[in-house]
From Swiss-Prot:
Protein name: Photosystem I iron-sulfur center
SUPFAM superfamilies in the record: 4Fe-4S ferredoxins
Any one Gene Ontology cellular component term annotated for this protein: plasma membrane-derived thylakoid membrane
Chief location bin: membrane
Cofactor: [4Fe-4S] cluster
Binding site for [4Fe-4S] cluster 1: C11, C14, C17, C58
Domain 4Fe-4S ferredoxin-type: 2-31, 37-68
Subunit structure: The cyanobacterial PSI reaction center is composed of one copy each of PsaA,B,C,D,E,F,I,J,K,L,M and X, and forms trimeric complexes.
Cofactor note: Binds 2 [4Fe-4S] clusters. Cluster 2 is most probably the spectroscopically characterized electron acceptor FA and cluster 1 is most probably FB.
Gene of this entry: psaC
């Protein structure tokens, strides 16, 4: 089951995670609730391969993805889904 995950509090809107993703899972979307005015969102979680390049690219060390291979992939980016 896929779901959108948004990063609110510590996302600085740098887009490094978006550029690092080899499967184009992440995108920046407008968001008035953070300082940068945009946040990273993952509308295509079903395409995530669990490489963690986005996590490595994140300069605030906030982005975290846990991938459990099997029937369902579970992801956590620090906030509720």
């Amino acid at each position: 089951m896929a779901h959108t995950v948004k990063i609110y509090d510590t996302c600085i809107g740098c887009t490094q995670c978006v550029r690092a993703c080899p499967t184009d899972v992440l995108e920046m979307v407008p968001w008035d609730g953070c300082k940068a005015g945009q946040i990273a969102s993952s509308p295509r979680t079903e395409d995530c391969v669990g490489c963690k390049r986005c996590e490595t690219a994140c300069p605030t060390d906030f982005l975290s993805i846990r991938v459990y291979l099997g029937a369902e992939t579970t992801r956590s980016m620090g906030l509720a889904y």
